[in-house]
């Protein structure tokens, strides 16, 4: 595990312990049962792809450890609506506070504003967090293979599936891919950001995509700023993308989303 993930795990473990004291699992599980039913995250992506469209998971992110504050004018419901109007298939909402200035309240507010399925984007170390995600309306959770051993990843995935949620399994090297393929969830996200150095290169997706079985749903993550980046990854078979920072920095988020997804000559020549 990288140094940054070690630090993150330390504070997340403290957060989880405090959350369990404040709201016991039994109470949280009861809330999860009465939450709005899950919206199919994978199903929404597959519907876009079946129509010949690129599937975008549009991210609501206020800040990041590497870039600091990304968007000062931060209104999750308005951003969610803009992404939906721009053609996104799903949303991703950062809920980690120390590193990303995120909040579960942002997820609740964003989901209430739209009909799109929503991913809780956070560092998951305990099945309590999965129940917490569902209780707040999340339709999908994230498993970062670099942060978990196989047993923990399996437990978290099992908890999510039991609650009717989808799972995005994130990898950034071949070893993590091999471990991810032991899990049941079809969605494999290739993070182009090195979690140790924070360096971003699309070559990561280009190297790993050919190794991912055809029955899995590939997602390109990080380093996607323009239609040319999407076209580059489409050439190795990736048609679903998670994009946050480049869209969050735009004044007109809906227009920027439409532009990113625009099917111009650059993307339609030899890219599919």
Swiss-Prot record:
InterPro entries: Aldolase_TIM (IPR013785), Indole-3-glycerol_P_synth (IPR045186), Indole-3-glycerol_P_synth_dom (IPR013798), Indole-3-GlycerolPSynthase_CS (IPR001468), RibuloseP-bd_barrel (IPR011060). One of its GO terms (biological process) is L-tryptophan biosynthetic process. One of its GO terms (molecular function) is indole-3-glycerol-phosphate synthase activity. The keyword Amino-acid biosynthesis applies. Its EC number is 4.1.1.48. It is an enzyme of class 4 (lyase). It holds the Pfam family IGPS. It catalyses: 1-(2-carboxyphenylamino)-1-deoxy-D-ribulose 5-phosphate + H(+) = (1S,2R)-1-C-(indol-3-yl)glycerol 3-phosphate + CO2 + H2O. Pathway: Amino-acid biosynthesis; L-tryptophan biosynthesis; L-tryptophan from chorismate: step 4/5. Disulfide bonds: none annotated. Transmembrane segments: none annotated. The keyword Aminoacyl-tRNA synthetase does not apply. Keywords: Amino-acid biosynthesis, Aromatic amino acid biosynthesis, Decarboxylase, Lyase, Tryptophan biosynthesis. PANTHER family: INDOLE-3-GLYCEROL-PHOSPHATE SYNTHASE (PTHR22854:SF2), TRYPTOPHAN BIOSYNTHESIS PROTEIN (PTHR22854). Belongs to the TrpC family. This is Indole-3-glycerol phosphate synthase.
